[in-house]
Amino acid sequence: MEAVIKVISSACKTYCGKTSPSKKEIGAMLSLLQKEGLLMSPSDLYSPGSWDPITAALSQRAMVLGKSGELKTWGLVLGALKAAREEQVTSEQAKFWLGLGGGRVSPPGPECIEKPATERRIDKGEEVGETTVQRDAKMAPEETATPKTVGTSCYHCGTAIGCNCATASAPPPPYVGSGLYPSLAGVGEQQGQGGDTPRGAEQPRAEPGHAGLAPGPALTDWARIREELASTGPPVVAMPVVIKTEGPAWTPLEPKLITRLADTVRTKGLRSPITMAEVEALMSSPLLPHDVTNLMRVILGPAPYALWMDAWGVQLQTVIAAATRDPRHPANGQGRGERTNLDRLKGLADGMVGNPQGQAALLRPGELVAITASALQAFREVARLAEPAGPWADITQGPSESFVDFANRLIKAVEGSDLPPSARAPVIIDCFRQKSQPDIQQLIRAAPSTLTTPGEIIKYVLDRQKIAPLTDQGIAAAMSSAIQPLVMAVVNRERDGQTGSGGRARRLCYTCGSPGHYQAQCPKKRKSGNSRERCQLCDGMGHNAKQCRRRDSNQGQRPGRGLSSGPWPVSEQPAVSLAMTMEHKDRPLVRVILTNTGSHPVKQRSVYITALLDSGADITIISEEDWPTDWPVVDTANPQIHGIGGGIPMRKSRDMIELGVINRDGSLERPLLLFPAVAMVRGSILGRDCLQGLGLRLTNL
């Protein structure tokens, strides 16, 4: 069918111009005609006897179904076939009158001259109409009756009626050919009957003024030739090899496609899905060894190209081994010709080295397919070796990283690993449960057991986050609403104790502990060198807080007086004050990462909490709600922290804790090592010891 489509398409382009149908439309029309039984084979379309039934059938189909696409295509094809037929008849007539011989139009016999082929009408009852049936059935030719004469004089004797010139010579028997060349349909029928002259025998040329026939053409049995070619199989030629009139010819690859692929490799890398898609698209059709090696030399660097050459050679050796075991392997040409070898597959055989035209002419279709498939597989192996993926076991979700970004990094690393495809989904789901943030882990643990794929887990987490977003801003808002009553209580107490001009609130003095003035205004202020100076920690005389020997043991106690005074009254100002102001109530809340540096085995080495920056607190206090239960704590000499509501029981971390503050942009401040206090408080507090160690101020937040 491909040959018929090409012939019809060429004729349509010649006689229809820009309105010629495409090969796809012609192929669809031929398939429909064969399906409807109007054509036994695509070559029957050349026969004029099948044109009228096709026109009638397609017209009826267009009226019933309302689809005129095939009818329009047939109209263009029919016009091209008629134009080609008329041009061929005219050419054959000219050859005859010039004495060149050959052609469809037979020379006039001694009896009469027939009408031109375009003026004859063929009746179903006449013997001439049987030529189509005889051609399709390929029956032996039979003698036909003398064709009807017309009302003109004979060419030889000039007699109008009753010419006996037909007995002057014996024409050869009629030729019954196939439908491959419609111009031969009727040759032999027009030459009359009788005679034993063999078919194809050369006839003597008739001299002017003498009776006799012009020599007929030397006919070739094209039907038998076509059958022999069909039995050997049509040649399969792969892109970029194209078929021209002189045979297969090599055409180079599109430079723009190669340039775009090289840019993709440089920007995206070899393992990128975009790169693999472009390589597979470019190598979707078989390529020559010349094109394959040049393509890889352009898109790969020197080292990856050397790796690719070795991998390609290994793949070609596998093909050769399979072809050696099976003589009818496609690379061996289905058993025709010599067996393939490594030199042929690499384009190094005689006549192929540096000669793409020679490779296109000498390589078999099966060899081209094997060459391209081996090159593509070698490219995949080089991509895995040259750009190995990061270890998926080391990927964890960052403090400020979204779950989608974490899932992207994890899935990309797992798919680029050497894990079998069946094990990738369970590994990804297990990493979601162990490597994500604690709040995400809680969501995944609470997920239904019916979620068995990574996509279902991701969708579930995103849906839950839309309902209850677990972000730093949400946690900060929750913390601020929880401690807002405490802040209001402190503000109200300060308002009740206002004195002095302008209603300025007077706080407790850090020197003497009395309300109503500041430390700078304290009348009991002593100079640093005075031996009568009172210690703010132990309330002793003769030294200050920096020189106090009980400084380490008294951390967490109120500086100054009151060690033996018991719990603080509620009406007095607490030592652990809340620095949160009403205008900026969410600013002192920060995200903190705590890491246990001890050797004690724990379930989690690091936890994320939200803490309040409090410049009025002496020490850092971690709430028992935030403190992991398996992190060890010890009792202290001073087991209480004095604050709002009196004393609060306190314990201290046995191991040193590394504390890091996470900024709003996700970066970490310089970590600090300390032994924080653990108490039953509403929220964790970062005191002055932490702020001084980190170099933070509330005004910097």
From Swiss-Prot:
Question: Site Cleavage: which residues?
Answer: 155-156, 166-167, 177-178, 239-240, 476-477, 479-480, 488-489, 577-578
CDD domains found in the cross-reference section: HIV_retropepsin_like
Q: Where is the composition biased (Basic and acidic residues)?
A: 128-141
SMART domains named among the record's database cross-references = ZnF_C2HC
According to the entry, every stretch annotated as the Peptidase A2 domain falls at: 609-690
User: Where do the ZnF regions (CCHC-type) fall?
Assistant: 507-524, 533-550
Coiled coil regions in record = none
GO biological process, any: viral procapsid maturation
What Gene3D superfamilies does UniProt report for this protein, alphabetically?
Answer: 1.10.1200.30, Acid Proteases, Human Immunodeficiency Virus Type 1 Capsid Protein, Immunodeficiency lentiviruses, gag gene matrix protein p17, Zinc finger, CCHC-type
* Chain span(s) of sequence motif Nuclear/nucleolar localization signal: 524-527
Q: Which UniProt keywords apply?
A: Aspartyl protease, Capsid protein, Host nucleus, Hydrolase, Metal-binding, Protease, Repeat, Viral capsid assembly, Viral capsid maturation, Viral matrix protein, Viral release from host cell, Virion, Zinc, Zinc-finger
Its domain comment says: Capsid protein p27: Proton-driven dimerization of the C-terminus facilitates capsid assembly.
The protein, known as: Gag polyprotein
Lineage, uppermost ranks: Viruses, Riboviria, Pararnavirae, Artverviricota, Revtraviricetes
Gene that this polypeptide is encoded by = gag
